[in-house]
Each structure stands twice: as structure tokens, then as C-alpha cells.
UniProtKB/Swiss-Prot annotation:
Name of the protein in its database record: NH(3)-dependent NAD(+) synthetase
Keyword Magnesium belongs to the record: yes
Pfam families attached to this UniProt entry: NAD_synthase
Family: Belongs to the NAD synthetase family.
Physiological role: Catalyzes the ATP-dependent amidation of deamido-NAD to form NAD. Uses ammonia as a nitrogen source.
GO CC annotation: cytoplasm
Statement: the UniProt record of this protein carries the keyword Magnesium: yes
Single biological process term from Gene Ontology: NAD biosynthetic process
Known catalytic reactions: deamido-NAD(+) + NH4(+) + ATP = AMP + diphosphate + NAD(+) + H(+)
Organism for this UniProt entry: Lactobacillus johnsonii (strain CNCM I-12250 / La1 / NCC 533)
CDD domains tied to this protein: NAD_synthase
Pathway linked to the protein: Cofactor biosynthesis; NAD(+) biosynthesis; NAD(+) from deamido-NAD(+) (ammonia route): step 1/1
Binding positions (Mg(2+)): 53, 166
Lineage: Bacteria, Bacillati, Bacillota, Bacilli, Lactobacillales
């Protein structure tokens, strides 16, 4: 392996091969253990987009919650799935299919268009210009505000969908979809998550669809792979310790270095990670 590749693989804890059944059980047990160690928590809250990551995470949450109810006899354990469209969601049918697959205890829909537009309006009233890219980040952060509000009303924790193939590049909004209390997919790459969904009997179109962030109005269907400048196949191969082309490796390592700040808490005077790049 390349020197930096070895460091990244170790940080992300990606295995070269997985047993999907074992990883499903590992994630469920992790979610249950967090609740057991924090008995004041009774709810998991997750935003559902209809993509692979939230579909898998939501299914694991519901399975963990059902086991907690069965094992403890406590019916207050709940999984709340939240759909968070900005106006009309183009792939709303996929989000509905994900909900049908997960069978959450509660399925909520909160449209974030009004608060996002209000935020843009009051900021631009000061003379600032909010770009479409910036507005996309506002959407992501507003979605997390909603999830934490719901969690706060239900003795809950917010679940994140971050995984190795996303974490290495910081391909999420800082304090937006990158904010959460617990991330059960951390250690998995994209193909491994897909294998777990197959094992769980997920409808094929939910894990075969091209991943998109769907934050920018100017480029609503921009594929992740285009935004990243590298394919998920190359990313997965790299994270599993395999050889990839020099071009792909350099792009992956460039993304890793550029996004280092996203993998840390706010910088303090005692930190020096930002000086290493």
C-alpha cells in the first residue's frame, strides 16, 4: 500500500472483505449498546433521503429498537424516520420506498423550504450574497436542526449516515449531515453497505441508484462521483487496501488532506493537524 493509503485505511477501519450478516449484527449491537449505556435515551432519529446510506442506517436502527423493546419490555423505545424535502423532492418515491422497507415506528415529513428561504432572505438583507452552494449547506444544516429538535422532544439521539467512503473526503456539510450522535456505518465502504442491504432484502433500486447530494439547485442531480472526481469503485478499492491508478490515488489523497478539518472538533491552540498538510 501507499504510505498515506495505509494511514487512511487504519483511520477508517475498513476491512478488505466483510461478512454482511456479521456486520449487520455488529451495527445493531452497537446501536443497542449505546442505548443501554445511556438509559435516558429512548429514541433514535434519522433523516431519510431514499439513498443507500440512510436506507441502510434506518433499517439497522429499526431492528435495534425492536430488539430493545423485546429484550426490556419497554415500549417507549422508538425509531423516528424523518423525510426532509426542500419543496418537492424529485425522488420522493424512493424515500417512500425506503420508509416502507424500514417500517419505522414513526414516519415524519418536515419541509425545510420555508426556514431555509427565510434564513437566506435575512442574511442577504445585510448585503451578503448567498451562493447556490452556500444555500445547499444551509439546507443540510437546517435538516440537522430539525432532527435535533425532534430528538430533543423524544429523549432521543440523532443517527448519522457517515461511512468510510464518505468520511475520507469530508463529503458532507460540516455541522450539517456531518453532525450526529452516533454513526453505525463508520468502518464500511460503499460496496460493503450495498452488500448489507442485499442481505437485508432491500429493493434493488434503492442501492443501485447513482448517489447524489441533491443540495444545489443549479445542479440538483450532480452525481457524487462527478463532485468527488473519482469513482466509488476506486474509493472502495483504495480503502480496502487494493491498488488503484495513480490518478485515482492522488485524487483520493488530495480529498483526504483538504477535508482534514472536518474530522476534528473545532481547532484549539493545542492542535497542529492543520499544519501537516
Amino acid at each position: 500500500m501507499r504510505p498515506l493509503q495505509e494511514k487512511i485505511v487504519a483511520y477508517e477501519h475498513v476491512l478488505p472483505e466483510i461478512d454482511p450478516k456479521k456486520e449487520i449484527r455488529k451495527s445493531i449491537d452497537f446501536l443497542k449498546d449505546y442505548l443501554k449505556e445511556n438509559p435516558f435515551l429512548k429514541t433514535y432519529v434519522l433523516g431519510i433521503s431514499g439513498g443507500q446510506d440512510s436506507t441502510l442506517t434506518g433499517k439497522l436502527c429499526q431492528m435495534a429498537i425492536e430488539e430493545m423493546r423485546e429484550e426490556t419490555g419497554n415500549k417507549s423505545y422508538q425509531f423516528i424516520a424523518v423525510r426532509l424535502p426542500y419543496g418537492v423532492q424529485a425522488d420522493a418515491s424512493d424515500a417512500a420506498d425506503a420508509i416502507a422497507f424500514q417500517k419505522p415506528d414513526q414516519d415524519l415529513i418536515v419541509n425545510i423550504k420555508e426556514p431555509v428561504d427565510a434564513m437566506v432572505k435575512v442574511v442577504e438583507a445585510t448585503g451578503q450574497k448567498i451562493t447556490d452552494f452556500n444555500k445547499g449547506n444551509i439546507k443540510a444544516r437546517q435538516r440537522m436542526v430539525v432532527q435535533y429538535a425532534i430528538a430533543g422532544a423524544n429523549n432521543g439521539a440523532v443517527v448519522g449516515t457517515d461511512h468510510a467512503a464518505e468520511n475520507f473526503s469530508g463529503f458532507y456539510t460540516k455541522y450539517g449531515d456531518g453532525a450526529a450522535d452516533i454513526t453505525p456505518l463508520f468502518r464500511l465502504d460503499k460496496r460493503q453497505g450495498k452488500a448489507m442491504l442485499k442481505e437485508l432484502g432491500c429493493p434493488k433500486h434503492l442501492y443501485e441508484k447513482a448517489p447524489t447530494a441533491d443540495l444545489e439547485e443549479d445542479r440538483p442531480d450532480l452525481p457524487d462521483e462527478v463532485a468527488l472526481g473519482v469513482t466509488y469503485k476506486d474509493v472502495d478499492d483504495y480503502l480496502e487496501g487494493k491498488d488503484v491508478s495513480e490518478e485515482a490515488a492522488e485524487q483520493i489523497e488530495k480529498l483526504w488532506k483538504k477535508s482534514e478539518h472536518k474530522r476534528h472538533l473545532p481547532v484549539t491552540i493545542f492542535d497542529d493537524f492543520y499544519k501537516q498538510n
